[in-house]
């Protein structure tokens, strides 16, 4: 009996140590180390909000492409999936289906004003103009379908906003089944952006720069008549750029690294909750940036001028 318990313990330990990726990833020698390495999932993966677990962000099927962004000193890896969502990788033993983004049909409404990727099996592209009288922007009746993974029908209405801010509102079809001529902006139902992924399983994805500094990928869960954001640990940016001013990086290696004006840089991540937004002020960013020498660190730019926040 004692030998059996030892054997089971060894099997469990080996299972827990099974590789998550097709490449070997070693623990870093510092709290966080940037890798930026493309790989594949060696098993089904669950991306979580925290390094040791926490709420789920996304599920990835085995053999799917991933990019390993960061590794901590305990060997936990922060990755992004093919869509661009980030999370800490864990082995997914739940048997739950992976996020469904492949095979969706692309449709466009309003002269490229809005782009949708949807599943025609559970939703119908309407491509109708609902309203747009006087100086109000045109409202597009874009889709109708079962978007929450159940039998409930939803409409998707979109408009460009009074100041050119594209947004879409997702709401249950009224009891009489008729399509309203308009719908009001609702913080619980309306998302900013022009590109949407609607697989029909209760998840809604956006890929947009509307009201944002960088192109950002987000995920929401549709529950009843509300949309709830799925919180990612970081937002992936992945943009090559040039420094508009000289600034200093707080390096992941604990050192300070200068970046000269005009130097090529790569903006990797945004930590969206590092600096809480203040009312009536432009929200500040905390960006993970790599300089031309390959040094990686954090910087808080002045969002008014583009300079480093002193």
Please state what every model-predicted region is.
Residues 1-16:
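Gram-negative bacterial Sec-dependent N-terminal signal peptides
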Residues 19-31, 58, 67, 80-122, ...:
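Boundary regions of SH3-family modules and the immediately adjacent low-complexity/disordered segments
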Residues 20-74, 109-110, 115-128, 236-282:
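Beta-loop motif signature
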Residues 46-48, 76-80, 217-225:
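Short beta-strand segments and strand-loop junctions that repeat across beta-rich extracellular domains
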Residues 71-72, 82-83, 157-165, 173-175, ...:
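Short, flexible beta-strand-to-coil junctions
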Residues 145-156, 200-203:
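Acidic, glycine-anchored loop motifs typical of Ca2+
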Residues 160-161, 179-258:
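Short aromatic loop motif centered on NTY/YTY
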Residues 165-168, 213-217, 260, 284:
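Short, surface-exposed coil-to-beta transition loops
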């Amino acid at each position: 009996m004692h030998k059996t318990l030892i054997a089971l313990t060894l099997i469990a330990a080996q299972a827990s140590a099974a590789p998550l990726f097709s490449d070997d990833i070693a623990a870093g020698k510092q709290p966080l180390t940037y890798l930026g390495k493309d790989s594949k999932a060696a098993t089904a993966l669950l991306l979580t909000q925290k390094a040791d677990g926490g709420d789920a962000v996304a599920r990835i099927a085995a053999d799917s492409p991933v990019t390993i962004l960061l590794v901590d000193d305990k060997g936990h890896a922060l990755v992004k999936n093919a869509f661009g969502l980030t999370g800490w990788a864990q082995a997914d033993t739940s048997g739950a289906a992976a996020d469904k983004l492949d095979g969706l049909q692309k449709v466009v409404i309003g002269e490229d004003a809005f782009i949708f990727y949807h599943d025609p099996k559970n939703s119908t592209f309407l491509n109708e103009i609902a309203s747009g009288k006087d100086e109000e922007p045109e409202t597009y009746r874009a889709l109708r379908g079962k978007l929450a993974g159940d039998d409930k029908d939803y409409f998707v209405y979109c408009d460009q906003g009074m100041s050119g801010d594209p947004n879409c509102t997702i709401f249950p079809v009224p009891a009489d089944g008729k399509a309203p001529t308009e719908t009001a902006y609702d913080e619980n139902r309306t998302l900013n952006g022009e590109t949407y992924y609607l697989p029909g399983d209760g998840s809604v994805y956006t890929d947009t720069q509307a009201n944002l500094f960088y192109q950002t990928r987000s995920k929401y869960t549709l529950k009843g008549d509300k949309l709830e954001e799925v919180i990612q640990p970081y937002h992936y940016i992945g943009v090559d750029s040039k420094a508009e001013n000289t600034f200093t990086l707080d390096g992941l290696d604990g050192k300070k690294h200068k970046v000269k004006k005009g130097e090529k840089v790569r903006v990797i991540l945004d930590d969206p909750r590092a600096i809480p937004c203040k009312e009536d002020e432009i929200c500040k960013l905390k960006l993970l940036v790599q300089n031309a020498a390959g040094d990686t660190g954090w910087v808080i730019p002045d969002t008014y001028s583009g300079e480093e926040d002193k």
